[in-house]
Amino acid sequence: MFEFGSIIVTVIAVFITIPICLYLFLTRHFNFWKKRGVIYVRPLPFFGNLKDVLLQKKYIGYYLKDIYEENINKPYVGIFAFDQPALLVNDLEIVKNILVKDSRNFIDRMVKVDESLSPLNANAIFALRGQKWKHVRTSLTPTFTTGKMKNMFYLVDKCGQQLVLFIEKFAKAENPVAVKDAVERFTMDVTAMCAFGIECNSLQDPKAEFSNLLHRIFQLSFTSAVANLATFFAPWVQNFFRLKLMDSEIEDRIRDIVWRAVHLREKTGEKRNDLLDYLMELRTSETSKLDGDDFVAQAFGFLVAGFHTSSMTLTFALYELSVHQDIQTTARTEIKDVLEHHKKKVTYYSIKDMKYLDMVVNETLRKYPAIPFLDRRCQEDYPLTQDLMLPAGTGVYIPVYALHHDSKYFPSPAKFDPERFSEKNKQNIPHFAYMPFGEGPRNCIGMRFGSMQVKAALIHILSNFEVSPCKETRIPLIIDPKPFNLMALGGVYLNITKFNN
């Protein structure tokens, strides 16, 4: 009887002790900001401050904007990503120090991917740290010079012409166009041609192999959402739960595609002046050697960074142009006038002359930034202000979406107004209040290419079609809370009418 009673007591003690120990472990850092006298958002065990985001109830950009606005007069506010303390920075002067002035101490991103879980993601430039990042960045930078962009433009323009033919089918049938699907096919074909050296032809063949592969990479699920969030905020969660960003079989398929393209070019001697050509030059370079997964990962990184962000920018730009016919008309008139001076050809230089189109794209990126925040990791203890010494290893987040929607910097932020970026008015935008591609040494290396393909697509569409809302168009748009990147819930459907001339 005594032994049985002892067992019962032991079992009860274990059941009580385990939850207590787990609670203490999960909340062990929750006094971090309190000890340092920093205002912070009260966290929950395990979730930290990310509960609504993890449960896919709120888009991450909206959530950080809420925190930003609740602490609008404070230079920074403490947050918790799962159990990890991090700092959300509101003050533009501090933002400048982190991204530019003292960037050496914040050169690494919080992004970290376990190589055993995803070798290609782990070795892509956006996930690298330290000297390896510096080596790869230095090696890749010449790939995106003006000369290289000009050489690749014919590939982008070819896809733009195919996009017109694709949309024409819907215009003739007088059917609404699923804009996201159409422009994803365009950016998919551009990326496949420039980064992988293959003609995907998704605009002509909806069942194209590369198209299916790409959709599998970006397929949404609860697990992939948690894995993405953990990658940016708390990499240990991804490692502990062994959360893969994509299947190993997909990575093997990407390797196969890249190496087949490389070996074919080595065999035939073909030169296309695309990204793959430039990567192949690096592969044999003595000073900038890239090979194996380091080589494949850069082509893959170009795919991940360029495909989704550019297609979303195009989707939102076309939506805004459809509901603002005056802006659409002004953009189309400029396109027509500029092309008249360039023998009616869309070229790299004709795009550079389209100032109003540039304003439209800039305003789209303001209202709908592809990346809702910037992340940096403090390398060494850093005096952020006189009152706060930021410990090494602390994550710092800059709420880009919130800054882009702050009425202090952009009056009537919900209004789509390209005139904000006119030569006269853009001088009124404080530096670091507008950062669609980041700032400093870790800004987006492919931003010029991304901008080029977005503008090329808009030129081809606006030159041939009028875009307008249809009965399926949601006005205003509702943002989907599930994806990490900005996306319209239910997609964007528009009427697109072909011009007779």
Swiss-Prot record:
It is found in: Endoplasmic reticulum membrane; Microsome membrane. It is a peripheral membrane protein. The keyword Endoplasmic reticulum applies. One of its GO terms (cellular component) is endoplasmic reticulum membrane. Signal peptide: none annotated. GO terms for molecular function: heme binding; iron ion binding; monooxygenase activity; oxidoreductase activity, acting on paired donors, with incorporation or reduction of molecular oxygen. Its EC number is 1.14.-.-. Its main location: endoplasmic reticulum. Keywords: Endoplasmic reticulum, Heme, Iron, Membrane, Metal-binding, Microsome, Monooxygenase, Oxidoreductase. Heme binds at residue 444. Its cofactor is heme. It comes from the Eukaryota. SUPFAM superfamilies: Cytochrome P450. The keyword Membrane applies. Belongs to the cytochrome P450 family. PANTHER family: CYP9F3-RELATED (PTHR24292:SF54), CYTOCHROME P450 (PTHR24292). This is Cytochrome P450 6j1. It comes from Blattella germanica. The lineage of its organism: Eukaryota, Metazoa, Ecdysozoa, Arthropoda, Hexapoda.
